[in-house]
């Protein structure tokens, strides 16, 4: 993100939506190339979901993060609860010896029914001396937003809403690194807080109301990581302890009478301890052996009107081993993870059905390297997805009126995934692949009829199969001026050439009681370096319509929009300035038929916006300053696996 001006302009969520293959929707959440995503930040589970996760990513400035890693074939070293894929948002940047700092700022503007503004500021300060290194990153985001939504059936408008939002978001991240000869200790503390207000005018069959919602969320995260190193550089032993807490309060009040409509909240506490050991030895040509154990516990308590109506506990114990080997042009990965789950709790009226289960999750990959940087890869892994606390929460932390409600389900059961993938990749940019994911007991959000209205619920679906095809094709414009032979020499910097990148994906969801068709997804991104080294980037997303996406048939293309960005660096490349316009033609909207009902859902956000963003690396006067590894990300990848993702 930090080097891609079209991605780091705006919020993290706006940048993620531009990634080929990543789908974000109001009704179905986030998926990447047909795989359910688990969201990590700095290699640690974020542990927030649904509308809280969306709000968090919309509030986090994209120019405050370094990169996004998407792991499409998570091996045994990753928790089996990762589902099908992991997205890791890395906020940290490289520390430098002696004091250095980076300042980031952004502003954007929209005008629909009225003018609205967004602005963010962040500062990263880091330094290193002979005893320890440290980093501090802090920032804020002010976000005004607009949304209109519509629920209707064939003859009646059930609910027509306009929402005027004002969100305030603050974050503070610290990192300390202590070196003890070969060993090191990393200490991290993160704090984020958001205060979101919304004015909601709604009308529909039999009602008209004007409400105000307040949503306050605080998140604390502490991590300790001790990295033991040996004379044998391939031998590594890591110990990590992580504590994460989330507190959320949601209130909805009528603006006319002042009466309370909703008074809900929850408290969540998550502990995790893990240790990992790895070592290389001579077998075939080179083999790496990894093993480790993990224990974590989640405590979740939901309140309604000050009374606890869900008390939920989950404990996980796991152990894994994995081998990565290479022999001539072949690479192999074989691993397995054993996980044990204990889930219990109670609502205000009854005890939850206890869940005690131990499962084994194998994974295997084989890769054939045709020539350097060109390979064929086949992968299988079994994963599980435990119901997240947003889906379990029986209380409404979204919005409701007399005709529209949102419900969680405390009795949801885990989902088991069998994931298969085959891929051909060349030079990191071209790829063609097919994947299949078979899910048993899939947790799914559905819109159903509820009396004379509509309700959003979560439930288990016995069997879901997702077929996914992907193609990524880079087209350097020099191909037309210098020919194929010169282009294939790859004697150039990709960031400094003119090119077009095309992505095509096809996804089909097969459900037991739905007969639907698949969806095609398209993305085109072009970079042109203009005179004075001004970088112009254009990005276009769209999809076909009429296909089923789980229990929804899309009436409008997913995230259809055209964005442009102009970027230039100044002051010896220390100052980066970008000017952008997102959704120029104002085409980004959502529209779905809720299958099995006669309900239609439509929504439109203020997606057309113009803005400017800047990053200024305050130069150090000390010529001895040099970069060190980042320390806000406490799970540093020190080596690459035998098989790339």
Where are the regions that the model predicts?
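Transmembrane beta-strands of outer-membrane beta-barrel pores
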Residues: 105-111, 129, 140-144, 180, ...
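Conserved C-terminal beta-signal and adjacent last beta-strands/turns
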Residues: 321, 516-645
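Surface-exposed extracellular loop regions of Gram-negative outer-membrane beta-barrel proteins
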Residues: 91-107, 145-148, 190-203, 241-242, ...
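Outer-membrane beta-barrel signature, preferentially recognizing the C-terminal barrel domain
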Residues: 219, 354-355, 374, 384-440, ...
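Extracytoplasmic beta-strand/coil segments of soluble accessory domains associated
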Residues: 13-49, 85
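Flexible loop and strand-edge segments within Gram-negative outer membrane beta-barrel domains
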Residues: 112, 143-270, 312, 385, ...
């Amino acid at each position: 993100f930090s080097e891609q001006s079209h991605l780091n302009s705006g919020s993290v969520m706006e940048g993620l939506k531009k990634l080929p293959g990543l789908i974000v929707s109001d009704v179905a959440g986030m998926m990447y190339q047909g795989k359910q995503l688990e969201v990590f930040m700095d290699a640690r589970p974020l542990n927030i979901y649904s509308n809280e996760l969306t709000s968090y990513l919309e509030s986090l400035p994209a120019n405050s993060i370094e990169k996004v890693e998407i792991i499409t074939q998570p091996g045994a070293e990753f928790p089996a609860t990762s589902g099908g894929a992991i997205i890791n948002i890395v906020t940290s940047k490289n520390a430098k010896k002696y004091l250095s700092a980076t300042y980031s700022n952004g502003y954007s503007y929209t005008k629909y029914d009225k003018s609205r503004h967004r602005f963010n500021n962040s500062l990263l300060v880091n330094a290193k001396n002979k005893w320890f290194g440290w980093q501090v990153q802090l920032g804020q985001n002010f976000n005004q937003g607009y949304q209109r939504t519509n629920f209707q059936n064939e003859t009646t408008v059930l609910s027509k809403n306009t929402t005027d939002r004002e969100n305030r978001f603050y974050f503070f991240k610290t990192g300390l690194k202590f070196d003890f000869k070969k060993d090191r200790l990393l200490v991290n503390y993160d704090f984020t807080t958001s205060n979101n207000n919304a004015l909601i005018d709604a009308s529909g069959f039999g009602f008209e109301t004007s409400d105000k919602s307040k949503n306050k969320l605080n998140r604390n995260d502490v991590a300790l990581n001790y990295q033991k190193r040996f004379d044998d550089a391939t031998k590594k032993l890591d110990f990590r302890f992580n504590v994460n807490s989330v507190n959320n309060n949601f209130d909805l009040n009528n603006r006319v009478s002042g009466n309370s409509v909703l008074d809900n909240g929850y408290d969540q506490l998550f502990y995790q301890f893990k240790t990992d050991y790895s070592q290389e030895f001579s077998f075939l040509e080179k083999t790496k052996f990894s093993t480790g154990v993990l224990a974590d516990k989640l405590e979740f308590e939901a309140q309604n009107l000050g009374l606890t109506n869900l008390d939920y506990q989950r404990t996980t114990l796991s152990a894994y081993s994995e081998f990565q080997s290479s022999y001539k042009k072949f690479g192999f990965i074989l691993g397995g993870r054993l996980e044990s789950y204990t889930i219990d709790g109670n609502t205000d009226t009854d005890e939850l059905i206890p869940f005690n289960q131990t499962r084994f999750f194998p994974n295997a990959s084989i890769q054939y390297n045709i020539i350097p940087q060109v390979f064929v890869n086949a992968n299988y892994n079994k994963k599980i997805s435990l119901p997240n606390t947003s889906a379990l929460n029986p209380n409404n932390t979204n919005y409701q009126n007399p005709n529209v409600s949102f419900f969680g389900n405390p009795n949801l059961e885990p989902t088991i995934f069998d994931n298969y993938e085959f891929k051909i990749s060349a030079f990191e940019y071209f790829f063609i692949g097919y994947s299949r994911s078979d899910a048993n007991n899939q947790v799914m959000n559905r819109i159903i009829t509820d009396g004379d209205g509509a309700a959003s619920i979560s439930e288990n679906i016995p069997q879901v199969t997702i077929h996914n095809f992907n193609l990524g094709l880079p087209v350097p414009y020099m191909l037309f001026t210098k020919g194929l032979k010169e282009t294939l020499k790859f004697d150039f910097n990709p960031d400094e050439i003119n090119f077009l990148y095309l992505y095509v994906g096809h996804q089909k969801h097969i459900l037991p009681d739905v007969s639907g068709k698949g969806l095609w997804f398209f993305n085109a991104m072009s970079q042109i370096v203009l005179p004075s080294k001004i970088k112009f980037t254009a990005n276009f997303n769209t999809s076909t319509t009429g296909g089923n996406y789980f229990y929804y048939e899309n009436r409008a293309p997913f995230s259809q929009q055209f964005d442009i960005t102009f970027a230039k660096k100044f002051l010896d490349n220390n100052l980066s300035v970008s000017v952008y316009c997102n959704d120029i033609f104002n085409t980004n909207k959502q529209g779905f038929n809720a299958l099995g009902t006669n309900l239609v859902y439509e929504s439109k956000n203020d997606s057309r916006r113009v803005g400017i963003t800047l990053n200024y690396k305050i130069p150090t006067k000390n010529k001895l300053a040099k970069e060190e590894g980042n320390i806000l990300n406490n799970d540093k990848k020190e080596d690459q696996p035998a098989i790339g993702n």
